[in-house]
């Protein structure tokens, strides 16, 4: 029987709903209140506190289709993705859970029923494993389910491992909840190599685990003793990709409908024909994790979850580049993904535009350095004498070209090499140590190069100019000529290019002659010289050549806005938090600004809001940004702030923005504060003891950020409104059911007056809105009769009278209810067959209802 992945998902959830389980939505990929976990990687993550007894929910049975990511930390599948049939960065885990409700027998019976009755898998294709001492689970499988003993495998502890160190024994840690588990395997047939679990050939692909049932029945103490839990629980997980492969008659997860759709979409976006290529599998997998991480609020960055996302994006982009992708392609897969995910893609559809934009920008940014980085990596591999690429080269690719180490490892592995991971980590640690010692941003580029040139900087007033090449260096050695492809450092006699300093990154652009073009990828200080780092894109270049030096004006303009905003931010922080605030580092780029400052505690939401208000106030005032050259002592006397870690000459450049900010600064700035447009803080957090970090965006970047936040907010509001409406409906349904139940009990209180059925009763705490339905039910049951009900709820009296149509010529409901209402401090009326009223005197209600019989008798 063929089933699509979406059909499998819906069948699983519906089956367990029929067994009394509450369907719970997938939680975010960013775990809530669990700092130990990088990403949600199992269905049980959102129920962790339920299993630990720290949280009680309205249900004791739950079922989910949980989105999971394994691409960082302990559970890291990234390096295997695309190279095996079943490794993914993103997957969905189907699960059913019992929190002290049912246990082993029901869990096993449910699993077997779903697999063999709902999915109709051949029983002879299934075999199971149990923990070696779990006789209870063995007997359930054997005697209750009927699986032959030779298809139930006992799995013990790993050789040389600790007690309970087994694939069939689950434990949260050295202490705490733990217990045995039973796993269900599917036999793909003897045409595929591999043996059953526990055999020497168990790593083959013939027998594939499809479902794991964990039985949390013990609490392990520090001394190793196992105490039975008073309410044992069940945690199960079944990867939807694996079971879908079986239902679709394929062996590899990448052959199921979801991946085939994405592989075809990737091939179309890239312009590649061979759908069996492994790189397409990598791209198809990675779009799932990247898209859903962004949906759940993770954005590409150089830290934490954001860096894992960046690594995955760059790995996908590199594989697309390998297949010949021209321009950005990765973001084009978001639409096909949203469609093929079916019921699991609803949220992605809502945020599709945001996800596409984030991916496109990230891909374009990486694309600027990808080709050159690949060229350097391939050259290094070509020249390799052994089989291991040194850690320094791996680090250089990471540090200069944004190549994550696992991306470099992928390329090396494709060519039969490996990387020196230990050497890379050592280089990383050395960089961290330099950063700690310096207490600021920036790296000492080419410290061994010595230049005799004193470059004149002319970039404050111009972004292009005529210059002469004074010196050129390749890999630290001075050269006189350069040709196409050479990566080099060029020193000019004068330059409009700003060298990285004071946290502002260096300019990029081009150096042009009639004979060649040099792409400047970075600009750094080299003693008194300014070093242009880059590569010869075409032609040749020689010492003494005259060049047109042209800065990337758009990028510089964006940087200048962020730099000016940094000054306003610094001043605003000192006004809001206090004069103790001092800059401890900064990074000003075209996309964002980052500002580190001294402060002992996290900023409150109110403080962040006030800082933003002050900065934007100064932006709207549109101060002219003025610069003056003066003696450093004079500058300090005027209150100019000096930047942390910077060295100053006797004569300094003082930058002023009205009377709000005055700082010593040699950077490039906007002309007026109004040019900044808008300032928005996007994050605030601690990076070390007493050091906080703010990241912010300006201008169009701020607008883009706000648009993205608004999109997420709107989606959440819509979701909450829909849930609230559903809850209101469910509450009313429950009230109606309760009223119907109460009306069934009232029928026994019917009396006869002059041969007519009469029911007079008082209720307490009933829902007044439900009384009308209750009277309708009673009228239907009596066929002929008169009903008068009084109810006291929250100190108020509710009255309702009902008369069947055959009696309205004698007794009218409106008159009856008004008679009672007048006695309880109210009044009312209505139709002859149905009328309602209210009152304020609850104490008078019993006597008022006692008067009803006589009133009715007078009219019959």
UniProtKB/Swiss-Prot annotation:
<dbReference type="InterPro" id="IPR002318">
    <property type="entry name" value="Ala-tRNA-lgiase_IIc"/>
</dbReference>
<keyword id="KW-0030">Aminoacyl-tRNA synthetase</keyword>
<keyword id="KW-0963">Cytoplasm</keyword>
<dbReference type="GO" id="GO:0005524">
    <property type="term" value="F:ATP binding"/>
</dbReference>
<dbReference type="InterPro" id="IPR018162">
    <property type="entry name" value="Ala-tRNA-ligase_IIc_anticod-bd"/>
</dbReference>
<dbReference type="GO" id="GO:0045892">
    <property type="term" value="P:negative regulation of DNA-templated transcription"/>
</dbReference>
<feature type="binding site">
    <location>
        <position position="563"/>
    </location>
    <ligand>
        <name>Zn(2+)</name>
    </ligand>
</feature>
<keyword id="KW-0479">Metal-binding</keyword>
<dbReference type="InterPro" id="IPR009000">
    <property type="entry name" value="Transl_B-barrel_sf"/>
</dbReference>
<dbReference type="GO" id="GO:0000049">
    <property type="term" value="F:tRNA binding"/>
</dbReference>
<keyword id="KW-0067">ATP-binding</keyword>
<keyword id="KW-0820">tRNA-binding</keyword>
<comment type="similarity">
    <text>Belongs to the class-II aminoacyl-tRNA synthetase family.</text>
</comment>
<dbReference type="InterPro" id="IPR050058">
    <property type="entry name" value="Ala-tRNA_ligase"/>
</dbReference>
<protein>
    <recommendedName>
        <fullName>Alanine--tRNA ligase</fullName>
        <ecNumber>6.1.1.7</ecNumber>
    </recommendedName>
</protein>
<dbReference type="Pfam" id="PF01411">
    <property type="entry name" value="tRNA-synt_2c"/>
</dbReference>
<comment type="function">
    <text>Catalyzes the attachment of alanine to tRNA(Ala) in a two-step reaction: alanine is first activated by ATP to form Ala-AMP and then transferred to the acceptor end of tRNA(Ala). Also edits incorrectly charged Ser-tRNA(Ala) and Gly-tRNA(Ala) via its editing domain.</text>
</comment>
<dbReference type="Pfam" id="PF02272">
    <property type="entry name" value="DHHA1"/>
</dbReference>
<dbReference type="InterPro" id="IPR045864">
    <property type="entry name" value="aa-tRNA-synth_II/BPL/LPL"/>
</dbReference>
<dbReference type="GO" id="GO:0005829">
    <property type="term" value="C:cytosol"/>
</dbReference>
<dbReference type="InterPro" id="IPR018164">
    <property type="entry name" value="Ala-tRNA-synth_IIc_N"/>
</dbReference>
<dbReference type="GO" id="GO:0002161">
    <property type="term" value="F:aminoacyl-tRNA deacylase activity"/>
</dbReference>
<keyword id="KW-0436">Ligase</keyword>
<dbReference type="InterPro" id="IPR018165">
    <property type="entry name" value="Ala-tRNA-synth_IIc_core"/>
</dbReference>
<keyword id="KW-0648">Protein biosynthesis</keyword>
<dbReference type="InterPro" id="IPR003156">
    <property type="entry name" value="DHHA1_dom"/>
</dbReference>
<keyword id="KW-0862">Zinc</keyword>
<dbReference type="Pfam" id="PF07973">
    <property type="entry name" value="tRNA_SAD"/>
</dbReference>
<feature type="binding site">
    <location>
        <position position="669"/>
    </location>
    <ligand>
        <name>Zn(2+)</name>
    </ligand>
</feature>
<dbReference type="GO" id="GO:0006419">
    <property type="term" value="P:alanyl-tRNA aminoacylation"/>
</dbReference>
<feature type="binding site">
    <location>
        <position position="567"/>
    </location>
    <ligand>
        <name>Zn(2+)</name>
    </ligand>
</feature>
<dbReference type="GO" id="GO:0008270">
    <property type="term" value="F:zinc ion binding"/>
</dbReference>
<feature type="binding site">
    <location>
        <position position="665"/>
    </location>
    <ligand>
        <name>Zn(2+)</name>
    </ligand>
</feature>
<keyword id="KW-0694">RNA-binding</keyword>
<keyword id="KW-0547">Nucleotide-binding</keyword>
<dbReference type="InterPro" id="IPR018163">
    <property type="entry name" value="Thr/Ala-tRNA-synth_IIc_edit"/>
</dbReference>
<dbReference type="InterPro" id="IPR012947">
    <property type="entry name" value="tRNA_SAD"/>
</dbReference>
<dbReference type="GO" id="GO:0004813">
    <property type="term" value="F:alanine-tRNA ligase activity"/>
</dbReference>
<dbReference type="InterPro" id="IPR023033">
    <property type="entry name" value="Ala_tRNA_ligase_euk/bac"/>
</dbReference>
């Amino acid at each position: 029987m063929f089933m699509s992945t979406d059909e499998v998902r819906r069948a699983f959830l519906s089956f367990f709903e029929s067994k009394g389980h509450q369907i719970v939505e997938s939680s975010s990929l960013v775990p809530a209140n669990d700092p130990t976990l990088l990403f949600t990687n199992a269905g049980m993550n959102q129920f962790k506190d339920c299993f630990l007894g720290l949280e009680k929910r309205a249900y004791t049975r739950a079922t989910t289709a949980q989105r999971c990511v394994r691409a960082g930390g302990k559970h890291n599948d990234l390096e295997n993705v695309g190279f095996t049939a079943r490794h993914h960065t993103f997957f969905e885990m189907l699960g059913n859970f019992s929190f002290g409700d049912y246990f082993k027998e029901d869990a096993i019976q449910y699993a077997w029923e779903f697999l063999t009755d709902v999915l109709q898998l051949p029983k002879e294709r299934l075999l199971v494993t149990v923990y070696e001492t779990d006789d209870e689970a063995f007997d359930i499988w054997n005697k209750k389910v009927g699986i032959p003993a030779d298809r139930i495998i006992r799995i013990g502890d790993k050789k040389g491992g600790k007690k309970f160190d087994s694939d069939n024994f689950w434990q949260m840690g050295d202490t705490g909840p733990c217990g045995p588990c039973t796993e269900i395997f599917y036999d793909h047939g003897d045409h595929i190599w591999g043996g059953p679990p526990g055999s020497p050939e168990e790593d083959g692909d013939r027998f594939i685990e499809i479902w794991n049932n964990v039985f949390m029945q013990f609490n392990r103490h520090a001394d190793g003793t196992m105490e039975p839990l008073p309410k044992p629980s069940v945690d199960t997980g079944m990867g939807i990709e694996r079971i879908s492969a079986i239902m679709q008659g394929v062996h590899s997860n990448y052959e199921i409908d979801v991946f085939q759709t994405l592989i075809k979409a990737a091939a179309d976006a890239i312009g590649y024909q061979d759908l069996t290529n492994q790189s397409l599998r990598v791209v198809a997998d990675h779009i799932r994790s990247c898209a859903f991480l962004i949906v759940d609020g993770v954005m590409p960055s150089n830290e934490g979850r954001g860096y894992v996302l960046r690594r995955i994006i760059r790995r996908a982009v590199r594989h697309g580049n390998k297949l010949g992708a021209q321009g950005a392609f990765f973001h084009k897969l978001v639409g096909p993904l949203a469609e093929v995910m079916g019921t699991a893609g609803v949220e992605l559809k809502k945020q599709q535009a945001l996800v596409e934009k984030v991916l496109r920008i990230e891909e374009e940014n990486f694309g600027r350095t990808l080709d050159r980085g690949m060229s350097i990596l391939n050259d290094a591999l070509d020249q390799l004498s052994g089989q291991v690429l040194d850690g320094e080269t791996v680090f250089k690719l990471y540090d200069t070209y944004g190549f994550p180490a696992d991306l470099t490892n992928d390329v090396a592995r494709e060519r039969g090499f490996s990387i020196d991971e230990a050497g890379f980590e050592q280089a990383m640690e050395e960089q961290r140590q330099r950063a700690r010692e310096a207490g600021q941003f920036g790296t000492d580029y080419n410290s061994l190069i010595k230049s005799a040139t004193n470059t004149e900087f002319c970039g404050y007033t111009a972004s292009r100019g005529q210059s002469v090449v004074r010196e050129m260096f390749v890999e630290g050695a001075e050269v006189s000529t350069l040709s196409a492809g050479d990566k080099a450092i060029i020193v000019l006699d004068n330059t409009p290019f700003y060298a990285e300093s004071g946290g502002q990154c260096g300019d990029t652009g081009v150096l042009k002659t009639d004979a060649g073009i040099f792409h400047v990828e970075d600009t750094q200080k080299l003693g008194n010289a300014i070093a242009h780092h880059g590569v010869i894109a075409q032609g040749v270049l020689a010492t003494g050549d005259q060049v047109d030096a042209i800065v990337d004006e758009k990028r510089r303009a964006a940087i200048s806005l962020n730099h000016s905003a940094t000054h306003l931010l610094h001043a605003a922080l000192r006004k809001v938090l206090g004069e103790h605030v001092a800059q401890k580092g900064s990074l000003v780029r075209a996309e964002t600004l980052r500002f580190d400052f001294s402060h002992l505690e996290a900023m409150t939401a109110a403080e962040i809001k006030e800082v933003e208000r002050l900065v934007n106030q100064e932006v709207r005032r549109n101060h002219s940004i003025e610069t003056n050259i003066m003696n450093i002592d004079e500058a300090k006397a005027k209150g100019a702030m000096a930047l942390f870690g910077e060295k100053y000459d006797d004569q300094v450049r003082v930058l002023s923005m009205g009377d709000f900010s005055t700082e010593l600064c040699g950077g490039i700035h906007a002309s007026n504060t109004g040019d900044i447009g808008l300032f928005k803080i996007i994050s605030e957090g601690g990076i070390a003891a007493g050091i906080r970090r703010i990241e912010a965006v300006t201008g169009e970047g701020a607008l883009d950020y706000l648009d993205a936040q608004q999109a997420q907010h709107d989606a959440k509001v819509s979701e909450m409104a829909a849930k609230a409406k559903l809850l209101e409906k469910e509450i009313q349904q429950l009230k109606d059911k309760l009223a119907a139940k109460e009306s069934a009990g009232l029928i026994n209180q019917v009396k006869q007056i002059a041969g007519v059925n009469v029911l007079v009763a008082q209720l307490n705490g009933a829902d007044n809105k439900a009384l009308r339905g209750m009277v309708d039910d009673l009228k239907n049951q009596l066929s002929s009769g008169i009903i008068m009900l009084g109810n006291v709820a929250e100190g108020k009296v509710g009255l309702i009278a009902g008369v069947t149509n055959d009696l309205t010529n004698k007794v009218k409901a409106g008159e009856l209810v008004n008679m009672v209402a007048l006695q309880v401090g109210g009044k009312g009326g209505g139709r002859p067959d149905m009328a309602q009223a209210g009152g304020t005197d609850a104490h008078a209600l019993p006597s008022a209802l006692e008067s009803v019989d006589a009133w009715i008798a007078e009219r019959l």
